[in-house]
Amino acid sequence: MKKVLINIILLFTFSISGMAQIEYGKTVEISKEVLLDKIKGGWAGQTLGCTYGGPTEFKYRGAIIHEKTPIIWYDDYCKDIFAEDPGLYDDVYMDLTFLEVMQKEGINAPAESFAKAFANADYKLWHANQAARYNILHGIMPPASGHWKNNPHADDIDFQIEADFIGMICPGMVNTASDFSDKIGHIMNYGDGWYGGVYMGAMYA
């Protein structure tokens, strides 16, 4: 075990040292085409990841999935699963709801607008999102809707699985992504549940 851990640390160290180092204060430019391709890749990865991982969700807690475990995949599988089990895609449709709010009201839309949009939406929610929906529909608005005193799922991963869209709309702008996370993430999460989302949004950015 110790040897494996040392090898992992060495691999991580070499991979970091091999990355292009950007001097503080310098800028990096990429074309709109490359940026758009990266954003499309992010959305594709998120949607395909939900589909591919769906059948194994909650079945291997505390264990690694055996490499011989068959995982179904065929050309129209993503579309079929979305029709059969749309609740699997809360990662995706919550993000799209938030983007729709920004499209209608601008990127500086208040937290209440994001909260009301998903609270009144006609789709399944789970854990922290569902508890936040209940709170919002009963007059407990953000950030109180995600606070642990009002939301028993405040530490869950709901915002963490939704924060990727924030990074995709804030390319290279980690602080801006964190500002969005502060506003949106506290609608449904608090504490570790919120910090995980801030981290994911920043990594995507």
Residues covered by each model-derived region:
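Bacterial Sec-dependent N-terminal signal peptides
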Residues: M1-I22
